[in-house]
Amino acid sequence: MADILTQLQTCLDQLATQFYATIGYLSTYHDNSPAIPPPDVPDAAPALAKIPKNSTAPPVPAGAPVPALSQASPPAQNPAHGAAGAGTSVGEGAQTPGPAAGAGADPNLPAPDSPRTFASRQRELARDLIIKEQQIEYLISVLPGIDSSEAEQEKRIRELEGELRQVEEERELKMRELKRLRRTLENVLTAVETGLYGDRELLEKYA
């Protein structure tokens, strides 16, 4: 099993991957509908009235009264250009946004999910992010010395060093005792082997 720091790094990498996947899903499968602010929340910047061409008047909010200067009759135009200008104005005014505005969209993009499916997957992605974040918080909470000061950690390190030296000394004593017992066992086996084979040789000699 990996140590806590390795697990923490793995969880952070997984969290970054989940963030990337979540943003990718939200960017790909939303329905591209415009955001509609609640009616009780005012806009940060009020809409401005349409500014006439070549006007020097400052912009005003859409609901403000129109200044007297802008109400004056526009300058006379050349009759030769009047019809063309009128035709242009009518043509521009007749253009309205509709389904044809999205005709240039990329046909390779997947179709957006239904609102119900999109909301369900949003909740699922959010739940996965919360679970991963809770795992990270738990791993951080069980790190050794997370609630200790620097002096306390140094003191604990010195205590562990002393315990490690003591355990090393005990290990060396056990190793020496093991070697002594091994030599004793070898001597016993040698004596037994010598006794058995020595008696057999005597029996064969006097048989």
Curated annotation (Swiss-Prot):
InterPro entries: Med7/Med21-like, Mediator_Med21. Keywords: Activator, Coiled coil, Nucleus, Transcription, Transcription regulation. It comes from the Eukaryota. GO terms for biological process: regulation of transcription by RNA polymerase II. Residues 146-194 form a coiled coil. Residues 91-108 have a biased composition (Low complexity). One of its GO terms (cellular component) is mediator complex. Its main location: nucleus. Residues 36-120 are annotated as: Disordered. Transmembrane segments: none annotated. One of its GO terms (molecular function) is transcription coregulator activity. It is found in: Nucleus. Belongs to the Mediator complex subunit 21 family. Component of the Mediator complex. Component of the Mediator complex, a coactivator involved in the regulated transcription of nearly all RNA polymerase II-dependent genes. Mediator functions as a bridge to convey information from gene-specific regulatory proteins to the basal RNA polymerase II transcription machinery. Mediator is recruited to promoters by direct interactions with regulatory proteins and serves as a scaffold for the assembly of a functional preinitiation complex with RNA polymerase II and the general transcription factors. This is Mediator of RNA polymerase II transcription subunit 21. It comes from Aspergillus fumigatus (strain ATCC MYA-4609 / CBS 101355 / FGSC A1100 / Af293).
